[in-house]
C-alpha cells in the first residue's frame, strides 16, 4: 500500500447570473466512484467539493477567484503537498504521473490535487503550489476533470506492474 493520502479538491457549482445549479453528469460521478473504489484498497482518496463564489453579470472574475482562494486555503493544511491542475503548465503523461506518485509515496504524506473553479486558480494559490501540471490544453467542464481518478489508478497499476495499463 502506498504511504500517502490523496485528496482531490474541486468546485461543485457553476453560476450564471442569479441562477446557481449543480452540474450532475451521473456517468462522471459513476466513473469517479468506480476508480475511487479501486484506489481505496491502495490509496485513501477523498473528493472535497467547494462552493464557487457567487457570480453576477457585472461581477469581477479576479475577485471571484480571490474569494475561492480563501475557501481553498481554509481546507489546506501546512503539511499538504498541493498539486494544481493548470492548463498553462506542463502536460504530463500517465508514466510521468506514475513517477510523481512514486515520489509522493516516499516524500509527501498528504497530496492534494486542486481542480480550479470556472475562472481558473488565483495567483495566491499558484504561488503556494508545490507542483503544477496539466492534463490537457483542452478545456473541460470542471466535474469532468474528476476523471483524474482513473489516471491515478492507471499510474498506480504501472508502479505495481499490473496489466491494466497495457
UniProtKB/Swiss-Prot annotation:
Keywords: Cytoplasm, Methyltransferase, rRNA processing, S-adenosyl-L-methionine, Transferase. It comes from the Bacteria. S-adenosyl-L-methionine binds at residues 85, 116, 135-140. GO terms for molecular function: rRNA (pseudouridine-N3-)-methyltransferase activity. It catalyses: pseudouridine(1915) in 23S rRNA + S-adenosyl-L-methionine = N(3)-methylpseudouridine(1915) in 23S rRNA + S-adenosyl-L-homocysteine + H(+). The keyword Transmembrane helix does not apply. Signal peptide: none annotated. Coiled coil: none annotated. One of its GO terms (cellular component) is cytoplasm. CDD domains: RlmH-like. Pfam families: SPOUT_MTase. InterPro entries: Alpha/beta_knot_MTases, RlmH-like, tRNA_m1G_MTases_N. Gene3D superfamilies: 3.40.1280.10. Its EC number is 2.1.1.177. It is found in: Cytoplasm. Its main location: cytoplasm. Specifically methylates the pseudouridine at position 1915 (m3Psi1915) in 23S rRNA. Belongs to the RNA methyltransferase RlmH family. PANTHER family: METHYLTRANSFERASE, RIBOSOMAL RNA LARGE SUBUNIT METHYLTRANSFERASE H. Homodimer. This is Ribosomal RNA large subunit methyltransferase H. It comes from Francisella tularensis subsp. holarctica (strain LVS). The gene is rlmH.
Amino acid at each position: 500500500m502506498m504511504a500517502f493520502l490523496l485528496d482531490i479538491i474541486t468546485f461543485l457549482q457553476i453560476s450564471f447570473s442569479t441562477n446557481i445549479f449543480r452540474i450532475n453528469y451521473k456517468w462522471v460521478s459513476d466513473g469517479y466512484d468506480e476508480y475511487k473504489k479501486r484506489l481505496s484498497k491502495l490509496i485513501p482518496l477523498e473528493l472535497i467539493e467547494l462552493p464557487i463564489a457567487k457570480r453576477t453579470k457585472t461581477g469581477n472574475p479576479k475577485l471571484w477567484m480571490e474569494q475561492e482562494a480563501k475557501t481553498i486555503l481554509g481546507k489546506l493544511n501546512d503539511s499538504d503537498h498541493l498539486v494544481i491542475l493548470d492548463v498553462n503548465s506542463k502536460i504530463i503523461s500517465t508514466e510521468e504521473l506514475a513517477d510523481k506518485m512514486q515520489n509522493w509515496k516516499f516524500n509527501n504524506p498528504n497530496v492534494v490535487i486542486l481542480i480550479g473553479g470556472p475562472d481558473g486558480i488565483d495567483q495566491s494559490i499558484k504561488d503556494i503550489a508545490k507542483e503544477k501540471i496539466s492534463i490537457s490544453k483542452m478545456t473541460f467542464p470542471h466535474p469532468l476533470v474528476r476523471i483524474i481518478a482513473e489516471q491515478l489508478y492507471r499510474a498506480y497499476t504501472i508502479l505495481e506492474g499490473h496489466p491494466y495499463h497495457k
